[in-house]
């Protein structure tokens, strides 16, 4: 039996509009690297879409969770945004078995975050900053970003163009002032209107 490695990453932690998506990819790092996976932010949307399909075909397991803004709010109101990632990452690890997981850590102390995941899941976890250098993490980054981008595109059809959804985007700020604000698509816990994000 081969040694299985997994990677976990997220997309959409910082926006005030839309969901956060956390993804796990378990697969051969060499195979994924040959596909050309890298940090999703460094790829064009078209390239991400192509890689997404290739990842689905090449990986042993791919899964993701969509965390809606209301759920993000329940964690942020209590100052527990990192705990949100911890909880959902643990659930994803249970869905895609591997011998070790490389996780892009939201915590300033990656060892603390990795230890917490190991305690919850009973699996070996290596948490790090800038984890996209690990092919499985880069692949998870791409999966999370593609899924989120698709959901955001659907949301824009429903509520209008709100820009990137990030607090620093002038179009997003303008939309928050004057746009249609369905309660379910906005993270009300963000301090964006006061000029900050959590």
UniProtKB/Swiss-Prot annotation:
Cellular localization per UniProt: Cytoplasm
A Gene Ontology BP annotation from the UniProt entry: DNA replication, removal of RNA primer
Required co-factors: Mn(2+); Mg(2+)
GO cellular component: cytoplasm; ribonuclease H2 complex
Molecular-function GO terms, alphabetical: manganese ion binding; RNA binding; RNA-DNA hybrid ribonuclease activity
InterPro entries, per the entry: RNase_H2_suA, RNase_HII/HIII, RNase_HII/HIII_dom, RNase_HII_arc, RNase_HII_hlx-loop-hlx_cap_dom, RNaseH-like_sf, RNaseH_sf
Record-listed E.C. numbers: 3.1.26.4
Pfam families reported for this sequence: RNase_HII
Cofactor remark: Manganese or magnesium. Binds 1 divalent metal ion per monomer in the absence of substrate. May bind a second metal ion after substrate binding.
Gene3D superfamilies: Ribonuclease H-like superfamily/Ribonuclease H (3.30.420.10), Ribonuclease hii. Domain 2 (1.10.10.460)
RNase H type-2 domain boundaries: 3-198
Reaction(s) this enzyme catalyzes, per UniProt: Endonucleolytic cleavage to 5'-phosphomonoester
Binding site for a divalent metal cation: 9-10, 104
UniProt superkingdom: Archaea
Role noted for this protein: Endonuclease that specifically degrades the RNA of RNA-DNA hybrids.
Family statement: Belongs to the RNase HII family.
Identification of the protein by name: Ribonuclease HII
The encoding gene: rnhB
